[in-house]
Every structure is written in C-alpha cells, then in structure tokens.
Amino acid sequence: MGMGYHDGMKTAARAQVNTALREDWLRTLAALEETLQAWVAQEPGWATQTGETDTISEEALGDYKAPTLTIHAPDGELRVEPIARNFPGRGIVEVYAWPTAFRVRLIQAEPGEWRVLTDSGIYLRQPWERAPFMLLARDLMGADAMMPAA
C-alpha cells in the first residue's frame, strides 16, 4: 500500500520540525562553545581547540555532527562533547578530564543556562558563570592530586 497524501504531509512536517530543532540545538552548542572559549581565554597558559563529533543519531533530530571543544591547561585537558538534545531538560553535554578521567555533564535548564550534573546524579549548586566553571575545570583535571595519600 502506498503512502497517502496525509502521510506525506506528516512526514514533511516532521522533517521540518526535526531540522528546526536540530539547527536550534547546533546554535545552542555553538553558543556554549563560544562562552567556554571566552572564559578559557582569560586564563594564562590555557588554550582551546575546536573539533566535531562522530555522527550523532537522534530520532527527533536525525543524524548530525556537533561541535566539540578541547580545553588545554597546564594540569591536563578537558573535552566538551555533546551527547544528545533529547534528554530531560534541553540537552546534555559531557565534560571529561584527562588525565583523571573524571567527568560531569552539563544539562541545559533554560536557553543559555547550564547546570552541572555529577556522575552521582547530584546537581552542583553553582551559577553558570566563569569563576565556578574554571574552578570545576581545575578540580576535574587535578582531582587525583586532592586525594589523600594511601
């Protein structure tokens, strides 16, 4: 049985919504990247490098590639990598550190407002501002140095 007129209209409408939502998500990620680059640029000895994810597949958005950011610091590196738009909230981005391999996730609560979610499922009670993010970045990269000696 072929596709009817209404089925074709639904498919076209869904494709338009998917494209609009995907483009909005990519704009959101670009804005996050710009914010983090501006914050990091103020730190002596820190630098950023942009990149792109492998293909991400989401039912509502289709297949797409998203921007990534690597933050180079004297004590290590942070990788900022989008995971998905369709997540409770308005998207999820993973932030993980090298050499510690510690990570947190950024959950977009409102446009331009991100909340930090730990692996324990606890949201950090910090505003989305430069100083708390830079402290978090340092803690993630050097967390093993803060552990008591055995």
Where are these regions (language model features)?
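Feature targets compositionally biased, intrinsically disordered low-complexity regions
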Residues: 1-3, 7, 44, 50, ...
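Charge-rich, low-complexity N-terminal segments
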Residues: 1-57
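Amphipathic, interaction-prone secondary-structure segments
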Residues: 52-101
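Short, intrinsically disordered, mixed-charge
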Residues: 38-42, 85, 142
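Generic preference for hydrophobic/aromatic residues in regular secondary structure cores
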Residues: 49-51, 80, 93-94, 104-116
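Short secondary-structure transition/capping segments
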Residues: 18-21, 89-101, 126-135
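Glycine-rich, aromatic-bearing surface loops/beta-hairpins
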Residues: 101-150
